[in-house]
Amino acid sequence: MAVLSKRSMKPSGFQRTREVKLGDVVEFEYELPEPLKNSKDIANWNLPINKQKWTIPSEILTQLQYEELDIEEATDYLVQIMDWRINGYWFYNHGNIEYLTGDHFFYLAFWRIDGVIPYWKDSDATFFYIERYCQLKKDCYGWMQVTNRRDGKTGKATSIIYNRITLNYNANGGIQSKTLKDGKVIFGKLVKSWQKLPPYLQPEDSGDTNPSQILKFVEPAKRSSKGGKKVYKEVLNSQIDYLSAVDNAYDGSKLKYYYDDEYGKTTEVDVLERWNIVRECLVQGRNIVGKSLHTTTAEEMEDKGGQAAKNLWDESDIHEAVKLGRDMTISGLLRWFKPATHGLEGFIDSYGYSIVEDPKKPILGIDGAMIEIGSKSYISKERLGKSGSTLAGEKRKYPLTIDEAFIEEGKLSPFDIIKLNEQLSHCGTLSNKTVKGNFVWIDRESKQVGWQPTETGRWSVLWMPPVDERNKLVADRRGYKPI
């Protein structure tokens, strides 16, 4: 009789509360559901630890298998699938208990990206955990992400918008990208993934097998015979479309879900101004009725688009919102920066965990290759010997901090762009409030001067050096001069 391995995590050991950090600072915390109390209800419980990993559940049926079920069996099956799509799924992964949100389960079990089956990895789990948290949080319109290139953000986003819209009646999903052409590409990817779904996951639609602008979940148009009575099917009356990048494209619409693709590369409009219009499509009175996801890669942020993206990022600072006494951020969004070290292709073990630090011995990767160094060492080595705009470009491609993600490449600058950006980052940490006051003598003999704040002061000071760095001077033939 199979038993749970002694080395496997017990449900009581599952960490429900997780932190989202920006550097060393906690941005916010989220809580995951309580795991199933009986270990035997968690998938893979009966497997040896080295065999425990994510695989599509054997309960998932092909369309042919589904059609062989009787009505009662088919109903029970769809109810189970619906439960997993909404409430999620639990499985053992190399001894650890892992939770898939409903959106994550749908993505892994059913969504195909260019015909490829996605695999589970820890950085994607965090992505979907944040998505779930924002879905449940009342005073939140959604969230924004900055990540490295080739992170699979488009596949995850299109999967989420499809899952959300097809679980609701009279729900509209909208997509915008940096241009109309790019929006069409994103929509085209969604359509291709939709076409690969088994028909039992394709709600009644308008009949267009390859829609180019809008995917409508409505009854196909048909003519009734003269004098005949039309009979209508029960349909979702929901839809997913994409529109041009202009700021008022969705003005006046009601959206259940909105996807903003590559907001950091959008130059046709100011993405912050566009978001201020779109967010009204997600609210009814004072109630938030829709959510949004905003993603961009750090590499190749356009000058104008990068600055607008930075403004949107800054307005999504929860700590600043708390200081102001607000219930939500100024933008209404939360934010997450994923360092390039996490989820980096080539540095993910066979169970889906990121190999950030150098392993003691080579580890088998999920791609079948051996991993001999961690992603942190790899990225550091790629930067060796590079400087100026070349190094800046490398940092933007694989950023380790949010400052590196927003670094200005400075291709036309004659100065060291890295040093300039370091100074910009430092200046950004300073208060922008000056203090009025006067410089007064503490001791004329030793030439010691102090600072006395007063509203009627003659001088305005933005920053003062540490006390032990003040009043440093040397005497020369002309008197005294500062060091």
Spell out what each predicted region is.
Residues 2-8, 12-16, 30, 142, ...:
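RNase H-like, metal-dependent nuclease domains and their acidic two-metal-ion catalytic environment used
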Residues 164-171:
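Post-Walker A helix-loop "phosphate-sensing" segment adjacent to the P-loop in P-loop NTPases
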Residues 180-182, 298-302, 342-345:
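Conserved nucleotide-binding/hydrolysis micro-motifs of P-loop NTPases
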Residues 269-288:
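Short, conserved "post-DEAD/DEAH" coupling segment immediately C-terminal to helicase motif II
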Residues 241-242, 288-297:
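Structural recognition of the conserved hydrophobic beta-strand(s) that form the central parallel beta-sheet
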Residues 138-161:
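Walker A/P-loop
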Residues 1-141, 189-193, 200, 210, ...:
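N-terminal accessory segments
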Residues 171-193:
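Conserved Walker A/P-loop ATP-binding site and its immediately adjacent core
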